[in-house]
């Protein structure tokens, strides 16, 4: 085993509950709400304990639903809720779902969001969660970008490395994340702060050149 590749956690584990309390507070978890924690066979148990403690402090009722799987980063759209009887109905009845694996492009996620359920994704390491807490002004900045992009119909992307890509947009919705799930029917990611969408079918044309510091996001999540 190459121990040089192992990342050592610097965050005091006792601070996790405080971080979750702050995050849940910004996500408007309130007294009397029901919070559903969707874990899997590899979810950090300290995250579950911290989530329970935060909900208890805020007066919310919380329970954990552990799915019998180990969801993969390289496969999206794989359902983890809905195959067992009653699980989708339970998810729809929650006020906030905290999910500890990527639920993107699943049918259950769309169903619960259409019903107004807030959904918060938590997948990063403890040290990253502390550093990536949503700062004041991030939501406003993201929504400003969201408004600009929704009016945009032609995009050109260039870089010093040689990227020169053009595409049309408007066929697919613009999705925005600002790090907290504070609005009904909103999906967010603790650590997120961006807008994203897809080009119109067949419109993308040009060259993309990767350079150090770039991130290839889903479904690969690889760093250059």
Regions found by a protein language model. Name each.
Residues 1-223:
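Active-site bordering "gate/hinge" segments
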């Amino acid at each position: 085993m190459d121990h040089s590749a192992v990342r050592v956690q610097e965050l005091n584990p006792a601070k996790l509950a405080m971080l979750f309390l702050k995050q849940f507070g910004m996500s408007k978890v309130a007294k009397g709400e029901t919070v559903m924690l969707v874990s899997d066979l590899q979810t950090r148990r300290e995250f579950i304990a911290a989530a329970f403690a935060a909900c208890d402090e805020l007066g919310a009722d919380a329970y954990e639903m552990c799915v019998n799987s180990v969801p993969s980063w390289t496969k999206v759209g794989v359902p983890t809720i809905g195959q067992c009887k009653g699980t989708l109905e339970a998810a729809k009845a929650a006020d906030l779902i905290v999910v500890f694996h990527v639920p993107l492009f699943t049918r259950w996620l769309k169903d619960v969001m259409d019903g107004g359920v807030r959904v918060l994704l938590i997948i990063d390491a403890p040290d990253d969660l502390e550093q990536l807490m949503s700062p004041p002004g991030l939501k406003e900045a993201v929504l400003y970008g969201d408004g600009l992009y929704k009016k945009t119909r032609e995009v050109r992307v260039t870089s010093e490395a040689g990227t020169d890509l053009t595409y049309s947009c408007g066929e697919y919705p613009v999705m925005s994340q600002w790090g907290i799930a504070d609005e009904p029917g909103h999906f967010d990611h603790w650590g997120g702060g961006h807008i994203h969408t897809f080009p119109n079918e067949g419109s993308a044309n040009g060259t993309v050149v990767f350079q150090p510091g770039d991130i290839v996001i889903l479904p690969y999540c690889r760093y250059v």
